[in-house]
Amino acid sequence: MLNVTITDSAQTYLRELLEKQACEGIGIRMFVSNPGTPQAETCIAYCRPGEAEEADHVMELSGFNAYFEDRSVPFLDEAKVDYAPDKMGGQLTIRAPNSKMPKISDDSPIEDKINYVLYNEVNPGLASHGGNVSLERLTDDGMAILRFGGGCQGCSAVDMTLKQGVEKTLMERIPELAGVRDVTDHSDKSNAYY
């Protein structure tokens, strides 16, 4: 269920922005990029007719529709969009307190499951060496493409960390994952732990 508040002042501001686009039926689309991770960002974009996804949730507002990416809905729970006018014009604010919170279930997308394991199980251990690992992308054949950073980039022990730590943990927790691949440039050893 959609639990997002768009205040009257935000609706007025957004409606005025949309009217300037001179596009009949234009709305907004709200989504979270990198949901459930520390890098999560809540975004609002124009949504021209035909750009909404079939699975999007729709909120009918005064003068326009707001579309919400289905995958982002759990991360937008209790989100609030507000507009506060000031001397310089005003500011649109988006508060999404659950955007960085992992919300994983059996039917969650595999990318969310990978990010959950990386940020909650793997990275806390790597942080003791000043390192981290993140998901770059998931290939069509189910391979997780990972990038190491911090003390892990260029570290001589990264192969062992990848195979015996990261890959083993991910494969145990996410059986549908085909494997992992590291795309980090390890020739840069400036921050390497070992």
Curated annotation (Swiss-Prot):
One of its GO terms (molecular function) is 4 iron, 4 sulfur cluster binding. Its cofactor is [4Fe-4S] cluster. Binds 1 [4Fe-4S] cluster per subunit. The cluster is presumably bound at the interface of two monomers. This is Fe/S biogenesis protein NfuA. Homodimer. It comes from the Bacteria. Keywords: 4Fe-4S, Iron, Iron-sulfur, Metal-binding. Pfam families: Fe-S_biosyn, NifU. The lineage of its organism: Bacteria, Pseudomonadati, Pseudomonadota, Gammaproteobacteria, Cellvibrionales. Involved in iron-sulfur cluster biogenesis. Binds a 4Fe-4S cluster, can transfer this cluster to apoproteins, and thereby intervenes in the maturation of Fe/S proteins. Could also act as a scaffold/chaperone for damaged Fe/S proteins. InterPro entries: Fe/S_biogenesis_protein_NfuA, FeS_biogenesis, FSCA_dom_sf, HesB-like_dom_sf, NIF_FeS_clus_asmbl_NifU_C. Belongs to the NfuA family. GO terms for biological process: iron-sulfur cluster assembly; protein maturation. [4Fe-4S] cluster binds at residues 152, 155.
